[in-house]
C-alpha cells in the first residue's frame, strides 16, 4: 500500500471477510460470480489443464498464457477494440498471465475457524482479551467443551436444569449423541455454543473500552494492596498486574487500528495466488508441487465433507458433525502453522509439510530473503580479516571488488582523460587490467567513502563508513578495534560493502558514520573501540619484559653457585651486561639487527624535559667514577650526577616492547591533538 507521503509500505493484520471476498471475486458478463475455490483438484491428469473451480482454476486466478483462455482463443491484451474481455465459453479473462502472481481466491468455510496465530502463539491474544485460560479455550475450539448461551430471556431446558450456569463444562459425550444433524443444529443454535463459533460470539460481544476501564481499575486496586508477606501471593499479584497491562495494550491496539476482535476467527480462508505455490515438472516429467497445495487440498476435502453433513445428510449424529468441525479446524491450523499444536504433519516420505508460517518466517522466509534481503546495486560481499596496519577509519577492499563497485566512476575517468573514446573501449581496458585503470581507481577511491554492514544490524554501529584502500587477496580488511561495533569475529564472518552515490549520502557518511567518530556505545555511552582478545594478548607479550628485576644481574657470593650451574648446563649462556642506548631509534635499530630481543632489559636515555623524577626511593646501588661523577641506580631508572650533585642525565630501565608501545601511544596522542587544533 502507499501512504499519504507516497511511501510504499506493507501492513500485516486482520482483515474483514468482505475484504477477503473483494480480493478474489470476479463478476463474469453473464452475471456469474467466481472466486470461490470449491474443488481440491489442481490439473486434469489427461489434458494437463487446470480443473474448473480448483486450486489452479484459470477463471479465478487468470490465464496461464497471456491473452489465451482455457479454450485456446486469443485476444490482444489492452486493446479496447477487442471485445469481449472474458471468454464466453470458459469465462477466463483475457489479461496478462502475471496476474496469477497476485490474484487470490477464497474458501468459504462451513464452520468458523480460529486463526491459530492468535490462539496458540504466546501470548495468546484471544485468551488475553477474553480473560480465560488458554487450555479451556483450546478445549472449546476443538469441540471438547461447550457453554450455555446467556441470551435467552425465557426459561429453557438447560437453564431450568441448571446444567451450565454460563460456565464451560464438558459435554462432549452427553449432548450430541441424542440428536441428529438437524436436531443438533436447532439445539446448539438455541442452547449451547461450541467450537470457534463460540469464540467468535464472545469476541463480538466485547466492549473494548469497558475492558480498558475495568482492567485499569483492577490494576490500581492490586497496586494499592501492597505486599501480602507471602512470596507466592505476591508473585501471583505481579503476574496478574502484568496480564492486565498486556490486556489494556491489546485493547488499545484494536481501537487504534479500528479492527474488530472477531476477525481473529475466520469464516473465509484466503487462497494464495498459484504462482506463489507452483507445480513444476522435474526431469522425467514428474510433477513437483508446493506443500501448501496439499494443505489446501486437505482443508477443501474436510470442508466439503462438513458441508455435505450439514446440508444433505439429515440423519447424521451430532457427534459426527462436531468431529468434522474439529478436523476442519486442525486442517486450517496445519495450513497456517504446521506443528504449533504438537507433532507436525508429514507426507508419505516422513517429511514435514512446509506451512504458510514456514514460508514467511526465518532467514530463508519470504520477508527476509525476498523483500528485506534483495540484492542491491553498487554493493558487494566478502569475508573479513584483520588489517592491523590500517587506520581506524580505513578499510581494505580487494581489487576484484573495488573495480566492480567503482567501475562506473573508472569508466568516466578514462573517458575524461581521453584514454578511452567510448564506454566499450573503457570496459575492455578494465577487463585487461591495464595499469592506468588502477591509477584512476585509486584517485576515485581517495575521495569516496564506502559503507560496511554486518547482518543483523541491531544498532546504528552495525553499519559504518570507511575510507577504502586497495589490498591484495579476496577478503575485506578491517581494523581490529571496530570489530565490537559490528559484533563480528575474524573467524569467517562476512560483511557487505555499499557505495553511497548521492552527495547527501556521502556527506552523511563523512559527518556521522565514519568509524573514528563512533567510539562510544549509543546505548550505554561506554567505549566500544577497546582492545579485546588477541589484541590484549599481543599487548601483554609486547610489555611483559623481564620479571627478574635489576638485582638479577648483580653478582655476589649468594648466587655464585647458581651462575656456575647455569654455565655448565647451558653452554650458550653468557652473563651479558644490560646495554645503554641514547635514543629509542637506536634501541629499535638494535632489535631489527637482532642484537637484542623484544623482552631484553636495556637502559634508555630519557630527556630531562620529558619527565621529572622526584622520589624518596633509596638507590639500590651507587657507582662512583674517577672524574667524580656517580650513578644512582634505582629499581627502574638510573640517575647520573655531577660532582655538584646536579642531574646530568637519566636512564630508564625498559624493553624494546615497551618502547614500541609507548611510541604508538605517543603518535596517537599527537595525531589527536593535531586534529583537535585543526578543528578548532
Curated annotation (Swiss-Prot):
InterPro entries from the UniProt entry: DNA-dir_RpoC_beta_prime (IPR045867), RNA_pol_asu (IPR000722), RNA_pol_N (IPR006592), RNA_pol_Rpb1_1 (IPR007080), RNA_pol_Rpb1_3_sf (IPR042102), RNA_pol_Rpb1_clamp_domain (IPR044893), RNApol_RpoC1 (IPR034678)
Subcellular location: Plastid, Chloroplast
Residues involved in Zn(2+) binding: 69, 71, 87, 90
Cofactor note (record): Binds 1 Mg(2+) ion per subunit.
Top EC group: transferase
Principal cellular location given in the protein's record: plastid
Assigned EC number: 2.7.7.6
Catalytic reaction list: RNA(n) + a ribonucleoside 5'-triphosphate = RNA(n+1) + diphosphate
A GO CC annotation given for this chain: mitochondrion
Alphabetized Gene3D superfamilies for the sequence: 1.10.40.90, 2.40.40.20, RNA polymerase II, clamp domain, RNA polymerase Rpb1, domain 3
Residues that bind Mg(2+): 489, 491, 493
The keyword Zinc appears for this protein: yes
Ranges annotated as spanning the membrane: none
MF annotations from Gene Ontology: DNA binding; DNA-directed RNA polymerase activity; magnesium ion binding; zinc ion binding
One GO BP: DNA-templated transcription
Cofactor(s) needed by this chain: Mg(2+); Zn(2+)
Function: DNA-dependent RNA polymerase catalyzes the transcription of DNA into RNA using the four ribonucleoside triphosphates as substrates.
Subunit structure, as described in the record: In plastids the minimal PEP RNA polymerase catalytic core is composed of four subunits: alpha, beta, beta', and beta''. When a (nuclear-encoded) sigma factor is associated with the core the holoenzyme is formed, which can initiate transcription.
Record-linked HAMAP family: RNApol_bact_RpoC1
Assigned protein family: Belongs to the RNA polymerase beta' chain family. RpoC1 subfamily.
Name of protein: DNA-directed RNA polymerase subunit beta'
Originating organism: Ceratophyllum demersum
Gene giving rise to this polypeptide: rpoC1
